[in-house]
Amino acid sequence: ERPSDLLSHGKRHTPTASLSPEIAANTITCISATKTFNLAGLQASTTIFPNKDMKRAFEEFWGRMDIRRNNAFSCVAMEAAYREGEEWLDQLLPYISGNFDYICDFCAKNIPQIKPNRPDATYLMWLDCRALSMTNEELRDFFIHKAKLGLNEGYTFGHSLAGFMRLNAACPRSTLEKAMRQLKAAVDSL
């Protein structure tokens, strides 16, 4: 449930554990301020367990995997973000939403072969590039060498995302405008 703070266009998040007592008893909830408040380098999160037995089993697993708890600095930073970051988040969400609008409008008008999928949460947007009729390798090479863009390849997230590329829209609008112009020029050159 990590991207639940990054909801777009008035969407609401329903925590999985709130659906029923039976579901709550079998749900481990993970939350983090790292994506929402750009604190990813702190590598910090919070895990909520429904019962002590499940928590104990995970602590044993974490110990075997040599995964440590959050450090003192990351805990203070997360607390500060949640306590003092509301104004920043209130400005961030419409900005990212505006970036999504820009991408959708730009593609519809200039690159109709690429169909952006507006997410309900997070700042990552899938671009459906299947109309370009490229293999995964061709699509990767096209984005890197022709468009000069380093996006995430969809197929690495599962076979159903072959032909998709993942774009990070949490950046200045000028960066997106440049990226979209580069993408248009690359598609036009096909």
Predicted segments, located by residue:
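Conserved PLP phosphate-binding loop immediately N-terminal to the Schiff-base lysine helix
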Residues: 1-18
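A short beta-turn/loop motif at secondary-structure boundaries
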Residues: 7-9, 117-120, 157-161
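Conserved core segment of the aminotransferase class I/II
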Residues: 20-97, 104, 187
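PLP-dependent enzyme catalytic core of the Aspartate aminotransferase-like
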Residues: 23, 142-151, 157-190
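Helix N-cap motif at beta-to-alpha junctions
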Residues: 51-52, 131-133, 172-174
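Conserved glycine-rich beta-strand-loop-beta hairpin in the small C-terminal domain of fold type I
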Residues: 79, 94-104, 116-129
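A short linear hydrophobic-aromatic micro-motif
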Residues: 104, 113-116, 150-155
